[in-house]
Structures are given as structure tokens and as C-alpha cells.
A protein has these predicted regions:
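Intrinsically disordered, low-complexity segments enriched in Ser/Pro/Gly/Ala and basic residues
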Residues: 18-20, 26, 81, 134, ...
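Cleavable N-terminal export/targeting peptides
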Residues: 1-47
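A structural signal for short, well-ordered beta-strand segments
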Residues: 55, 136-138, 175-177
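Long, hydrophobic/aromatic N-terminal blocks
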Residues: 36-80
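Alpha-helix initiation/capping motif
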Residues: 42-44, 70-74, 86, 110, ...
Length: 211
């Protein structure tokens, strides 16, 4: 009986030792997982940079004039693309510049080109491993239709959704509104009554590289 008790006590101690070892190993694994997760989630600081390549579909919406009357754009669906560079000023806020372009066809098959060059500011919301950037771009837009060309102001608010593949690369999509007021003073060849406010949008896929 005494031998049995001794064996039972030794077995109990052995089980406690094994259980403690397993628990410690599990805790170490959990700590490593938490560490990996914490280090994998992007945390940005002043000077961290990003480069974007975007491409997708350009969607004409409508024009309206100074009186508020709405007109069809008479444009087909088109294509658009852009290159963007940004630098972080804080963990959630970045600024930079964007150069883009689009094309679409008029009813008589003339091609409209627009080439916007903008300064851009972005605020980033993060939900690991996803990020949601909300941006505003302001700048100048060169519109070209055959021999006619005009430079106008442009504003482009946008929202995106990105998945972080790793610490350097992310892939996502953006929806962007184009507001292009084409205003004539009447002092030139075009009367002021021909001023129009263009409203368009695009939906693009994006590749993001951090460095």
C-alpha cells in the first residue's frame, strides 16, 4: 500500500510537471504570436514613405452649369491610371502628390484626355490586416480634346480599402470622385455662359509599396 501511495504521489508530481511545462510552452507560443501580430501591424512614423500604382475604370456622371441645370456628359466609360507618392507625418496622416490620366470617347469618337496633377492628403484607419485611407487631392487638370486644351482646377476625394500582404506590400481598391469646374470669364473666345462643372468618378485597383 505504501509503495502504491509512493507511486501515486510520484505520478501526480510527474503530471503536474508535464502540465506546467506544456502551459509554459503554450504561453511562450501565445507571446510569440502576439509579438508577431504586434510587429506585423504597420506602425508609421515621420518620414516613412509609400508609392502607389493605380489603374481602373473611368465613369462619366454629369455636368451642371452656373444655374444648376444638369447635362449628360455624352462620354463613354473610359480608362484611368495614376502614380502616387506619399510620406507620413504621423502614424495616421500622410501627404504627397499624384499624377494621373484618363481617356473616354465622345459620340463622334473623339477622345477626351484629362491629366490631373495634385497635392494629396490622406488619413488612415486601421483594422489589422486591413487599412482604409480617406483622401483629398487638389490641383490642376489639363483637359485635351483634339486641338483644344484647357487647364482647370480639380478636386478628388477618395476612399480605399487595402489588405497588407506583408510589411512592404499591400493590395487594394479605391473609389474616387472627380470634380472639375471649367469656368470661363467671358473675356476670351468662350462666353462665360459656357462654364460647366464636370462630375466624374473612377474605380481602381491599387498596388502599394512602402519604403
Amino acid at each position: 500500500m505504501k509503495n502504491f501511495n509512493k507511486k501515486f504521489i510520484l505520478l501526480f508530481i510527474l503530471l503536474l510537471f508535464i502540465s506546467g511545462s506544456l502551459f509554459a510552452a503554450k504561453s511562450d507560443d501565445d507571446d510569440e504570436d502576439d509579438y508577431d501580430k504586434d510587429t506585423y501591424v504597420e506602425s508609421y512614423s515621420l518620414g516613412d514613405q509609400m508609392f502607389f500604382i493605380n489603374g481602373g475604370v473611368f465613369i462619366p456622371l454629369f455636368f451642371f452649369d452656373r444655374s444648376g441645370e444638369v447635362f449628360d456628359t455624352n462620354l463613354t466609360l473610359g480608362g484611368t491610371g495614376s502614380l502616387c507618392w506619399q510620406v507620413f507625418l504621423s502614424n495616421h496622416f500622410s501627404v504627397g502628390g499624384e499624377l494621373g490620366g484618363m481617356f473616354a470617347l465622345s459620340p463622334n469618337k473623339r477622345i477626351l484626355y484629362m491629366i490631373p496633377l495634385m497635392a494629396k492628403a490622406t488619413y488612415w484607419f486601421r483594422f489589422y490586416p486591413f487599412e482604409i485611407p480617406i483622401s483629398i487631392g487638389l490641383g490642376g487638370n489639363l483637359s485635351i480634346l483634339e486641338e483644344a486644351a484647357h487647364i482647370d482646377f480639380i478636386a478628388k476625394p477618395s476612399v480605399g480599402f487595402y489588405w497588407n500582404f506583408n510589411e512592404e506590400w499591400a493590395f487594394g481598391a479605391n473609389a474616387t470622385y472627380w470634380f472639375v469646374p471649367q469656368i470661363y470669364s467671358g473675356s476670351g473666345m468662350v462666353e462665360s455662359g459656357h462654364s460647366m462643372f464636370g462630375n466624374f468618378m473612377d474605380v481602381t485597383l491599387s498596388v502599394l509599396f512602402r519604403f
